[in-house]
Amino acid sequence: MLTAQRVAQDLDGELIGDSEIHINSVCKIDAGTKDAISFLANPKYEQFLETTEAGVVLVKTDQVLPSRKDITFIKVKDPYTSFCIILGKYFNPVSHPKGISEKCHVNGNIDIIEGLYLGEFSVIGKNVSLGRNVKIYPQAFIGDNCTIGENTVIYSGVKIYSETKIGNNCTIHSGTVIGSDGFGFALQNDGTYIKIPQVGNVILEDDVEIGANCTIDRATMGSTILRRGVKLDNLIQVAHNVEIGKNTVIAAQAGISGSVKLGDNCVIGGQVGFVGHITIADGTQIGAQSGIPKSITEPGKQWIGSPIMPLKEAFKAQVIYRKLPELDTRVNNLEKNK
């Protein structure tokens, strides 16, 4: 039975309250039951410390606690990360299968390595290399000459075209397509287009996670590359020859045009659009629905808008924009009174 004392030991936290309270579930800070554990990381939810029904709450080391004796508090440096650790260790429902279904189809030979799972109606191409504990769920397709590293999970309906290289500890969610042709056509004098052959590939380094229904195009030449630790939300388009730097995270419906180079540790909001052939500096943060028409060269800055502006300038511009109807009325009155 999981107790508050065990959680405090796992997290090296300071326990305040009943060390023997049992924990059977997790909950949000504004809900819960006496046998549930929750956390407070964002100050805007601090009010719920007075009303939460959770029996155990993770808080920051400097958190001022309410005078409640019915809650056990555990003080930790980072409640959000600590909660993730507890979720993963004690409450993660994912249990991947093992074995090779008789209904999967393998073209050629593959090594039957430890922990391998090939689900029903999955298709494995020729000369495919699969690492230890790879999980390929039903109806996934792996093209010829692909490499998939250890502990990588490929969920149902994923399509991975030939020559793709995927590292260790990656997760690719259902409906994603990796390695399809980049959008390359040469305009002719008569207005028609000739397709440019896309002869490159896609490389996903270690610890990459791709959400559902993303599309990552192969390079025209060379490689489209997602560096170590990249995390993509659902419904994201990554065009040919894009490079996404280490530990960059991108929210849903973003579109990254061809040959864009995103730096390390960038944070990209939902529905952001990038023009092609630009470079984005390390640590850049871009707000949702922004349009990026040119390179960002200064690292660690925040941007928003379409076209983008520095965050503080954008806020000032919004204040002026909201005043435009009033200013228009005043100008019209001045014109009338000339």
Give the residues covered by each predicted segment.
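Terminal amphipathic alpha-helical/low-complexity segments used for targeting or macromolecular assembly
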Residues: 1-103, 164, 169, 175-176, ...
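Structural signal for interior beta-strand "rungs" in well-ordered beta-sheet cores
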Residues: 39, 99-310
